[in-house]
A protein has these predicted regions:
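Non-catalytic structural scaffold of enzyme domains
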Residues: 1-216
Length: 216
């Protein structure tokens, strides 16, 4: 039987998203939200490497001691790109799955991709991972924190997609040669279906492949 899995994300909203997803698969999660909202999370991501490592390591150690956790599911793109989870995994002995693991496998399959992320920290981490895996890949990206804030407020997906002009953004990416649009923020599957109905650009969501890597 799988031991409880550390579920870490930037805010309570996206942390609960993956808690619910794992529960549907019969996996117990240990709730570990880093920040109370997206603005605080962005501030955390631009803090020093030492500060970020200390916070995450402490949460890992606490979950290990209380629940015997051996794995962590990091459900936040920008957090994954701004924290050295490989080093923390080595220090704590926790096996870590992040969206970046999926991107490493994804990159060689494409020549041109578009990425939408929560902020520039997230976009930079995704870009670095994709290009290390496929240096010939052409990338275009956008950081759209206002969309994350709208999701946190509970705005309806169809209204959100329209108000933030996401179909126009997707169509611009397509016109520039993008083969697919990568959802580079774990909040964004919230509007995936609504946007899919408004664009012909294929939309990539790393969540399902992350579950496979976790062994679910």
């Amino acid at each position: 039987m799988m031991r409880p899995v550390i579920v870490m994300a930037g805010t309570p909203v996206d942390t609960q998203m993956v808690m619910d997803c794992l529960a549907a698969q019969g996996v117990e999660g240990v709730f570990c939200s880093i920040s109370k909202d997206p603005v605080e999370q962005t501030a955390f991501q631009i803090s020093s490497e030492r500060e970020k490592a200390a916070v995450v390591t402490a949460l890992f150690r606490e979950a290990q001691a209380a629940h015997g956790c051996e794995q962590a599911f990091i459900y936040c793109n920008s957090l994954s790109g701004s924290v050295d989870f490989d080093a923390i995994a080595r220090e704590t002995g926790v096996a870590v799955v992040t969206p970046l693991d999926v991107y490493r496998a994804l990159a060689p399959q494409y020549r041109s991709l578009a990425v939408i992320a929560a902020n520039a920290q997230g976009a930079a981490g995704i870009e670095r991972t994709l290009l290390l895996s496929n240096p010939d890949l052409t990338l275009r990206s956008a950081g759209i924190l206002p969309v994350v804030l709208a999701i946190e407020r509970g705005e309806e997906p169809e209204e959100l997609v329209e108000r933030h002009r996401l179909p126009e953004l997707a169509d611009w990416f397509a016109a520039q040669g993008a083969e697919a649009l990568l959802l580079g923020c774990t909040h964004f599957p919230y509007f995936k279906e609504a946007l899919s109905r408004r664009t012909r650009l294929p939309i990539l969501d790393p969540a399902q492949e992350m579950l496979r890597l976790l062994g679910v």
